[in-house]
Each structure stands twice: as C-alpha cells, then as structure tokens.
A protein has these predicted regions:
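Active-site nucleotide-donor binding segment shared across nucleotidyl transfer reactions
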Residues: 25-64
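Conserved His + Asp/Glu catalytic blocks
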Residues: 75-82, 87, 91, 103-107, ...
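A short secondary-structure junction signal
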Residues: 68, 106, 115-118
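Metal-dependent nucleotidyltransferase catalytic core
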Residues: 9-23, 57-98
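Helical scaffold of the NTase/Pol beta-like nucleotidyltransferase catalytic core
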Residues: 1-39, 197-206
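Catalytic cores of NTP-dependent nucleotidyl/adenyl transfer enzymes across multiple folds
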Residues: 112-206
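Residues in well-ordered beta-strands of folded domains
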Residues: 37-39, 56, 94-96, 103-105
C-alpha cells in the first residue's frame, strides 16, 4: 500500500484502513462511548508490517468497559489484562482483526493526557520539523527491532529515558523543536556512529 497521502488532504491510506477495519468488524461501535482515538505509529505513517492498531480510550467505569470488551473474545488472539503497575491503572485488550493486531488501552484519563497520545504528539512535532526523510529513517530503525520511542531518541539525539523524554516535547516551543532537529543533524553528520540504541534494553548510549 502506498504511503503517500491521498489527494485533497484525505487520510493516510493505512489510517483509513485501520478506521474502516474497526468499523467493519464492529469494534468501533462497541467502544464508541469511551472516546476512542487511534494513536501510535499508524497516524504518523511510521508503522511497519508488525505494528499494532493502537486505540486509546477514556474509561471511568472499568467494570462496564470490561464487560463490553469481553464481547471481543470472538476474535483470535484475544486477551484482556487489568494493569495495576501504571498510573493510573489501565485495561489492555488485544486481539487480531482480519489479520491485523489491535490493542485497546483504557485509562480513567482524557485520551489527550495519556502517555501514548503525548508520545504521538511529540513524535509528530519532531517529524514535521525534520521533513519526510525522518519518517523513513524511523521506519528503518523499527525494522531493526528498535521500539518507536527509542528510535526517536536515537534519530533526534535526545538524552535520557526515551519514554520520559518524549513526554516533554509536546510542551516545547517551536524554536526548541527546531533547535533539537538541527542539533541532531549536526551530531549525526559529525559522528554518525556516536549515537546508538541498545535494542534489547531500550537504553540510549552516547
């Protein structure tokens, strides 16, 4: 499938594919009451063949949500987990729909305040400032087995824990984003092998 955006400012083909899939299979209608949003790599056009369709929901009535989510047991690979190690606790539902892996992540937090959404906004800002070649490089790093957030901290020479560092980017000024992109280009041009990521531990190494 082409990664070029459809004419007339339409949706990216893979994002439209994901939306159509969720509606066609009845998943979207099932979770619509919880403000679902497709997040992750697909809306940014940096997904790979192994990428999930990530859906975020705002859920303040977890028992009701779980009862509805259990209707998805008809899909292969179904699992549902209540996670207590997140703040706040979350519900994660996974399954395969027409060959595509889907993950629904639900928390009692507005979607726009959830970590995964803020990561997506951070990545969007960096990609827009860096230009289309950046998305190509992120996909290349992901095909090497590097997860999305560590791939961004490698490409943009960001120090610290990738998952925490990216949470700061949505609050940066435009100048901060631009300066970060320029600095990363300088670092990579002066020493292209100085910045690596340990794909097994997700630790950024300088």
């Amino acid at each position: 499938m082409s990664r070029q955006q459809e004419g007339g400012g339409g949706l990216l083909p893979r994002l439209k594919l994901a939306q159509d899939l969720l509606r066609r299979t009845g998943v979207w209608q099932l979770i619509r009451a919880w403000n679902p949003v497709i997040a992750g790599t697909i809306p940014l056009d940096i997904d790979t063949d192994a990428s999930d369709v990530d859906v975020l929901c705002e859920v303040h009535d977890p028992d009701t949500f779980v009862r509805r989510a259990m209707e998805l047991v008809r899909f292969p690979g179904f699992s549902l987990l209540r996670k207590q190690d997140t703040d706040p606790p979350a519900i994660v539902c996974r399954f395969i729909a027409e060959g595509l892996p889907v993950e629904i992540f639900a928390q009692p937090t507005p979607v726009t305040e959830q970590r995964a959404y803020r990561h997506m906004i951070a990545e969007k800002r960096l990609l827009e400032a860096a230009g289309p070649d950046a998305a190509t490089e992120i996909r290349r790093l992901k095909t090497l087995g590097i997860k999305t957030e560590p791939a961004f901290t490698e490409l943009f020479a960001l120090a610290g824990d990738p998952y925490l560092t990216l949470l700061e980017v949505p609050d940066w000024s435009d100048n901060q984003v631009t300066d970060t992109v320029r600095r990363a280009r300088r670092v990579r041009s002066e020493c292209p092998f100085c910045l690596t990521v340990d794909a097994d531990s997700d630790v950024t190494v300088y």
